[in-house]
Amino acid sequence: MAPEMNNKLSYGEKKRAYVTFLAGTGDYVKGVVGLAKGLRKTKSKYPLVVAVLPDVPADHRRQLLDQGCVIKEIQPVYPPDNQTQFAMAYYVLNYSKLRIWKFVEYSKLIYLDGDIQVFENIDHLFDLPDGNFYAVKDCFCEKTWSHTPQYKIGYCQQCPDKVTWPESELGPKPPLYFNAGMFVYEPSLPTYYNLLETLKVVPPTPFAEQDFLNMYFKDIYKPIPPVYNLVLAMLWRHPENIELNEAKVVHYCAAGAKPWRFTGQEGNMEREDIKMLVEKWWDIYNDESLDYKNFNVHCGQKEDVHRKPKTLPQFFTDLSEADVLQCAKAPSAA
């Protein structure tokens, strides 16, 4: 499905960056600030690009600029009209992430959700061979997957031998499926336009853009170890597959796990390993020595910062008023 990703810069040194996505007026900006500081702590050589929808307010954009982020405003991407029930209402926003394929001023990008923290340098992932889509395999064991045959029969690709896939009853085993909260990809205009055209003819499914990206890139998907996107549910679903002290990237995607909202009251949030990971996130967020010190004018970005946020269509406005229009996170096993 994916066209050749060969839209390279033909001159100068390859540009690389990390990229994340932010929407709405909620508190998810704290996650992105924390991510920027985490990348700085690991001494990453590359900037953090934040793709923002038009409704992200000026004060949030200023916070991100003050942390050295590059702001790139994008327009929403809407799925075809249908009656799909998304696993979470705000997953519909995630289709806007497709816009990051048009950031062709960069030769390679690593996408990270705003509820992710990077605890060890992962710049080496930029050196993975071109032409592939790299991400970590997801887990099918949480209730958000209850609509799938995998969940119903207890099958998970994290432990495929525990419950084998019944080919005689359900047909061929599903292809490998990644969590779209973190992935390594190459921007490409041909791919970007083909993604948008394909979206017009592929019916939306419960996990929104994550299902779509899995379908689109299935032929070039290459799994990478779970240390590069530790989905928290792995700690209680597949502890045998996890060495917590080796995790380089932690994805705070379980219900109640967002550090800036953490109460410890939701299921599994009383675990000591979860509390430790939340504390590690706060240690980075509160570390003033990690703040980006930039005494120069933010050239070329003033217009984005001071422009009055645009009003999105009524559906997005309704989500915002319901306090769910925030940074779109990838669906996960949690």
Swiss-Prot record:
Obligatory cofactor(s): a divalent metal cation
Catalytic residues of the enzyme: K97
Its recorded reaction(s) are: myo-inositol + UDP-alpha-D-galactose = alpha-D-galactosyl-(1->3)-1D-myo-inositol + UDP + H(+)
Q: Which GO biological process categories is it annotated with?
A: galactose metabolic process; response to cold; response to oxidative stress
Q: What is its main location?
A: cytoplasm
> What is the enzyme's class at the highest EC level?
transferase
Entry keywords, A to Z: Carbohydrate metabolism, Cytoplasm, Galactose metabolism, Glycosyltransferase, Manganese, Metal-binding, Transferase
Name the domain of life this protein comes from. Answer: Eukaryota
Claim: Transcription regulation is one of the keywords in the record: no
* Expression induction or repression: Induced by cold in a DREB1A-dependent manner; this induction is accompanied by a reduction in trimethylation of 'Lys-27' of histone H3 (H3K27me3) in GOLS3 promoter. Induced by methylviologen (MV), a superoxide radical generating drug.
Q: From the UniProt record, which GO molecular function terms apply?
A: inositol 3-alpha-galactosyltransferase activity; metal ion binding
Any one GO CC term of this protein is: cytoplasm
CDD domains from the entry? GT8_Glycogenin (cd02537)
Q: Where in the cell is it found?
A: Cytoplasm
**Any idea what job this protein has?**
Galactinol synthase involved in the biosynthesis of raffinose family oligosaccharides (RFOs) that function as osmoprotectants. May promote plant stress tolerance.
Annotated protein name in UniProt = Galactinol synthase 3
Organism from which the protein derives: Arabidopsis thaliana
Upper taxonomic lineage: Eukaryota, Viridiplantae, Streptophyta, Embryophyta, Tracheophyta
